[in-house]
A protein has these predicted regions:
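Primarily EF-hand calcium-binding motifs
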Residues: 2-30, 43-72
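Short acidic, hydrophobic short linear motifs in intrinsically disordered regions
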Residues: 32-34
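Short N-terminal signal/transit or membrane-insertion segments
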Residues: 65-82, 125-128, 140
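A short, well-structured edge-of-sheet supersecondary motif
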Residues: 112-148
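Generic secondary-structure transition motif, activating predominantly at the C-termini of alpha-helices
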Residues: 24, 56, 60-63, 77, ...
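Globin-like tetrapyrrole-binding proteins
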Residues: 37
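Low-complexity, highly charged intrinsically disordered N-terminal segments
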Residues: 70, 74-115
């Protein structure tokens, strides 16, 4: 059993190193925190995701540091490693979330032009709502979120 843990730990360390290298665009063995956060956002994961509370709490404790080393990166991910691993391996429910949201924006713009129909007047709360109000929200099982309107 102990051997299995060592193998799994080595495997996790390798994948974390791979993720780090993918974000290491400046070649200085440091990554820019903003790039990591942008990667989260592009995949539909936000600051409001409770699984990322520890991650963002640690970032806030860094007092404005812009770049981090591999060791700091590894410590940041430790409590959300499974989520980050799914994200970096494009294994979230919607792997190319950015492309997906672009398509949704196009559909939303087309549907919003449709002025047919009426607001449901048999629901008292809806009677008072403007027929111009229109919104769309998506939340996947992995917690990827996107909203318009």
């Amino acid at each position: 059993m102990q051997n299995h843990k060592k193998i799994k730990n080595k495997s996790n360390q390798k994948s974390t190193a791979l993720f780090f290298q993918n974000l290491n665009r400046n070649g200085k063995d440091r990554i820019i925190l903003k790039d990591l956060i942008n990667h989260l956002n592009e995949n539909g994961l936000s600051k409001n995701d409770p699984r990322l509370n520890s991650f963002f709490s640690k970032i806030n404790q860094m007092n404005g540091i812009n770049e981090i080393t591999f060791e700091e990166f590894d410590k940041l991910l430790i409590e959300s490693k499974d989520l980050f691993e799914k994200m970096f391996r494009d294994q979230l429910v919607i792997p190319e979330f950015k492309k997906f949201t672009h398509q949704i924006q196009k559909i939303y713009a087309q549907v919003k032009l449709n002025k047919n129909g009426n607001v449901a007047d048999y629901i008292p709360q809806l009677k008072k709502v403007s027929s111009e109000n229109f919104a769309l929200s998506i939340c996947t099982l992995d917690g990827q979120r996107f909203s318009l309107g």
